[in-house]
C-alpha cells in the first residue's frame, strides 16, 4: 500500500488533520500507528480504505487507487473500525451475507477463532456486549483471509483475557502466513 501526498480536513475553514502525508506499507507485516487523540490516526485509516476522500493525494492498494472502490480491491482488505454497529441477526446470517465478498473466506478459520474467544457460532449479534461484538468482528475479519487487515483500536472494549486472546490469535494468524 502506498500513500502519496495525502491531505485531509473535515472542514475547509479548519486546519487540515493530515497534511502531505506519504508512506509505504508492506504486505505481511504488522504496523502500529501511534499518536495523541485527535491527530488523525483513524482518519488516515479511513482514507487508506477509501471511506474518506482526501483533499489532495491518494492511497493505492496493489497499485489501484482505493477511491475507485473496485471489487477486486475491496475484497483484499478488511477494516475493523473503533466504533461500529452490527445488524440484529445471528452470526451465521452475517457470514452468509458478507463472506461471499471475500473470495478466500475460510469458514474453518472462523470457527477456530470463535472457539478461542469462547463465542458460539449461533450468537445473535444484536444481543452482544461491545466487547463480544468486537471479538465476533475480529473473528470474521481474520477469516476473510484478506491481504490487508486494518484495525482501529482493536482491543478497545475487550477485557484483559480478551486482549490476551487477541494477541495470541494475531500471532497464530501471522505464523500461518496470511
Which residues make up each language-model segment?
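Helix-to-loop junction immediately C-terminal to a conserved catalytic motif
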Residues: 49
Amino acid at each position: 500500500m502506498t500513500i502519496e501526498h495525502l491531505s485531509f480536513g473535515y472542514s475547509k475553514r479548519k486546519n487540515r488533520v493530515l497534511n502531505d502525508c506519504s508512506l509505504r506499507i508492506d504486505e505481511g507485516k504488522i504496523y502500529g500507528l501511534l499518536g495523541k487523540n485527535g491527530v488523525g490516526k483513524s482518519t488516515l485509516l479511513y482514507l487508506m480504505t477509501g471511506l474518506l476522500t482526501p483533499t489532495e493525494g491518494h492511497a493505492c492498494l496493489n497499485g489501484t487507487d482505493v477511491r475507485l472502490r473496485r471489487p477486486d480491491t475491496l475484497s483484499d482488505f478488511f477494516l475493523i473500525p473503533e466504533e461500529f454497529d452490527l445488524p440484529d441477526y445471528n452470526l451465521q446470517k452475517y457470514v452468509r451475507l458478507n463472506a461471499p465478498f471475500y473470495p478466500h473466506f475460510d469458514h474453518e478459520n472462523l470457527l477456530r477463532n470463535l472457539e478461542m474467544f469462547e463465542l458460539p457460532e449461533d450468537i445473535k449479534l444484536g444481543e452482544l456486549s461491545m466487547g463480544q461484538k468486537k471479538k465476533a468482528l475480529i473473528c470474521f475479519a481474520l477469516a476473510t483471509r484478506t491481504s490487508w487487515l486494518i484495525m482501529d483500536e482493536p482491543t478497545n472494549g475487550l477485557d484483559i483475557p480478551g486482549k490476551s486472546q487477541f494477541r495470541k490469535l494475531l500471532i497464530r494468524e501471522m505464523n500461518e502466513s496470511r
